[in-house]
Amino acid sequence: MGACAEYVCLPAQPEDGALAIKPTNMTYEEAAAVTMGGLEALSFVRQGNIQSGEKVLINGAGGAIGTFAVQLAKSFGAEVTAVDSGEKLDMLRSIGADHVIDYTQQDFTKRGRTYDFILDVVGKSSFAGSMRSLSPDGRYLLAVPGLSQKVRGRWASRTSNKKVTFGAAHPNSEDLLFLKKLIEEGKIRSVIDRCYPLEQTAEAHRYVETGQKAGHVIITVGHEGA
């Protein structure tokens, strides 16, 4: 997963790794995206213990993890607010976001709204502001926390009813099969921005580093076009 190689060694037994047969309604490129984004998103959304009808905000919703997190939260019955740059908002609506916020125009922590679960995929929102944006018993998950956020998060969890947790995904076949079922039911899908041939891997990385990608960038072997 995430390897720029023509071949990869996998465990002999499916239970020893994250292995599943490709969904019949997906291309190989779309299926590749599930393993790098879908599995992490599922782990984070489950850690959020989302209940049907709850309000969920996802910061960094337009990336590889975020696009799956939006769809998974919706499949769990949540009302989802997606935060990202303006050019990604239409895409986020198309995958089910109920509300969208352009972070270059609005700071979600200053809108006076509260959420039952906030998932920060990118780690760039204000910690104090995000805590204020939680409901009294809200949960806040940081996928890429810094040291200061870890210290403040642990303290906040001990001194209030609000809970702060940190991202830790452990891919396994059971989760991959769960995602496969949702895909085959048409409840979630991969969002692919561009495909690059293996020979243009460096160019693909440069594009990703611009921060402009929506969803996934895929490296292909035997490339047949973007």
Residue ranges and their predicted role:
Residues 1-60:
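NAD(P)H dinucleotide-binding glycine-rich loop of Rossmann-like/cofactor-binding domains
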Residues 3-6, 85-93, 150-153:
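Short, glycine/polar-rich helix-capping loops at beta-to-alpha or helix-loop-helix junctions
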Residues 68-72:
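Rossmann-fold NAD(P)-dependent oxidoreductase module
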Residues 28, 55-58, 74-129:
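Adenosine-nucleotide cofactor-binding segment
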Residues 84, 122-188, 220-226:
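Glycine-rich phosphate-binding loop and adjacent beta-alpha segment
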Residues 8, 41, 73, 92, ...:
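Terminal peptide-recognition signature
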Residues 187-191, 203-226:
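C-terminal capping/lid region of NAD(P)-dependent oxidoreductase domains
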Residues 38-39, 60-67, 123:
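Glycine-rich NAD(P) Rossmann-fold beta1-alpha1 loop
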